[in-house]
Amino acid sequence: MARGGAGAEEASLRSNALSWLACGLLALLANAWIILSISAKQQKHKPLELLLCFLAGTHILMAAVPLTTFAVVQLRRQASSDYDWNESICKVFVSTYYTLALATCFTVASLSYHRMWMVRWPVNYRLSNAKKQALHAVMGIWMVSFILSTLPSIGWHNNGERYYARGCQFIVSKIGLGFGVCFSLLLLGGIVMGLVCVAITFYQTLWARPRRARQARRVGGGGGTKAGGPGALGTRPAFEVPAIVVEDARGKRRSSLDGSESAKTSLQVTNLVSAIVFLYDSLTGVPILVVSFFSLKSDSAPPWMVLAVLWCSMAQTLLLPSFIWSCERYRADVRTVWEQCVAIMSEEDGDDDGGCDDYAEGRVCKVRFDANGATGPGSRDPAQVKLLPGRHMLFPPLERVHYLQVPLSRRLSHDETNIFSTPREPGSFLHKWSSSDDIRVLPAQSRALGGPPEYLGQRHRLEDEEDEEEAEGGGLASLRQFLESGVLGSGGGPPRGPGFFREEITTFIDETPLPSPTASPGHSPRRPRPLGLSPRRLSLGSPESRAVGLPLGLSAGRRCSLTGGEESARAWGGSWGPGNPIFPQLTL
């Protein structure tokens, strides 16, 4: 009877081997088509699309490696009675199958979690770099799945009767009790997490959001029309997250946040994710969990368990492409997929700076700016300007898109001063040029500090030049002229060398108003200075600072800004040094 049972088992497995091979090839092509279709339809890969592509890639590996290996071995055994499983092939099959089974379970759970997060907390989802978190989640999923599934191949199995001794018995009860329990618990956790997240998503979509919309309409009907007219906030059916494009002071886009989806798109994506979760739970998760439980309970692996596990794994790889194809958002025709294949082969889509992104159901084209916030010299020719579609992000609807200007000093500096409080010109490059390496001293006599005569003479000449420039067009004219025409060259000519005096930079800093109330005062008309009371600005750490007697530790240490009043300078008349400071109290 044992031989007859073994013969029936072998016959059932061999009769299904050809079907597994054909279905595996079809699943491989279908999932590859889905990946190309998603890539072609969505120019900007969002976390949800990335997880769908990873799930399709996992199914490709499932159909290509373990299922195809099992089918080929069964066909070889059918063709030759001497051929059988060996230890290496069986270990590779078991490791790859359980790695991909766990990776599929966790990827589906992560997909449902991201959808719940996006629907329930839309603002937090867009501000939390969900794409990076999705990539990290996929890396963790594959690492955990691979480590756990590789342990049976390196010794974590039943040593009494090894699973690769007679054939390849890959059901968890034949591998070992410890592995079977760990695998079943992880599988159960992934299934429960996916179902809970889908339930919260459906509740938020079908009940919570319509209830808030009714409350908003009720509030808008009471007083919203008086407050804001037809476009008041109270008359909106629900809260919408605006699309945000973040740019720096140079006009270059640094990052962007997508706005709220339309009701149709949101419902389509929610239905797709829910269908994928229920598909996996009904065809793969629950059947494999039931088989594992009964096999561990009875410590046996009858043929129906092997057939059920293999066919359930094959069915999910075939049905996932059909589910994604049913969603209009990710459905692409043959021409679009072919163009995507050509672009991938020619590596035309590798440069992200020249591409276009999809925001607010329109197209946005990135425009590169120079240091002044204007387009480069080559784009001044009207013949080189390309026409954009009628609906794009350069002129977006005001309630849908917001543009933010984030200067470089705000992103890269530790200074927490609110630089947005002071209005600036859009083309201004130096929104804030820190003067932390300068020192301003107003002595009673310019020669009292013991400065070198060469420097003092140069200083007087520079002050006379500054007075002449300010009389002509303002003290900031030379620096702004350098920024506006010195970089690109005036009139399109070659740029002049950056021959820029330090005193001009210091004057620009001191005459530029800062937003902080405790900062230096803003630009004011220059008052006539008494003879000998010319401001002198030295750098902490320069040879001039050591010549006038600054402490060595201060000049070699942290740079700071020191400002002294005119009264303190008049009250002090002697020499000064480390033990006799010029100012009674200084803040570093």
UniProtKB/Swiss-Prot annotation:
Residues 39-49, 113-133, 196-275, 325-588 are cytoplasmic. It comes from the Eukaryota. It is a multi-pass membrane protein. The chain crosses the membrane at residues 18-38, 50-70, 92-112, 134-154, 175-195, 276-296, 304-324. Residues 445-474, 511-550 are annotated as: Disordered. The keyword Phosphoprotein applies. GO terms for molecular function: G protein-coupled receptor activity. Keywords: Cell membrane, G-protein coupled receptor, Glycoprotein, Membrane, Phosphoprotein, Receptor, Transducer, Transmembrane, Transmembrane helix. Residues 530-546 have a biased composition (Low complexity). Glycans are attached at residue 86. Residues 1-17, 71-91, 155-174, 297-303 are extracellular. The keyword Glycoprotein applies. Belongs to the G-protein coupled receptor 1 family. Orphan receptor. This is Probable G-protein coupled receptor 162. It comes from Homo sapiens (Human). The gene is GPR162.
